[in-house]
Amino acid sequence: MKYFRVHTSDVAWLTKQPRGIFTTVGKLVDSKTLTEEETAEYWKQREYFERVLPVPPFYKDGNPDHAITWFKDTPQGQDIWNQLTFYRQMCKKYGITLYKSETTTLPGQVIYEDDFQIAVINPSNYQVLVSTVKD
């Protein structure tokens, strides 16, 4: 199976891995970078994705194992990626370069899996292709 992860070059403090797209845009909200309208849209989008994309249970505990999530390159995973237009637009507007890491091997030890994604600990990035996300 193929897996992909969309992220920035910024390394997250907790995971010590590149920060993912959801957290990146969340940080724009936290820093009050977005306009009021964009912030309102962010909360609308976030509510939607929390409804349609399962939230791995370890997030309720603050992600104690420092897991990172990867989308499965399946119709379900691609559908979620295609719906992330707002997130991509905010990154572009605020000058944040997004990267897409892709691998055909498990990118670490899987601790969670659903139809859309996997979550891994102890990431192994030796067979990952990284490219810049185009619009």
Task: Go through each PLM region and give its residues.
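Intrinsic disorder/low-structure terminal segments
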Residues: 2-3, 8, 48, 57, ...
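Intrinsically disordered, low-complexity segments enriched in small/polar residues
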Residues: 1-2, 40, 46, 57, ...
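Acidic, proline/glycine-rich low-complexity IDRs
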Residues: 89-135
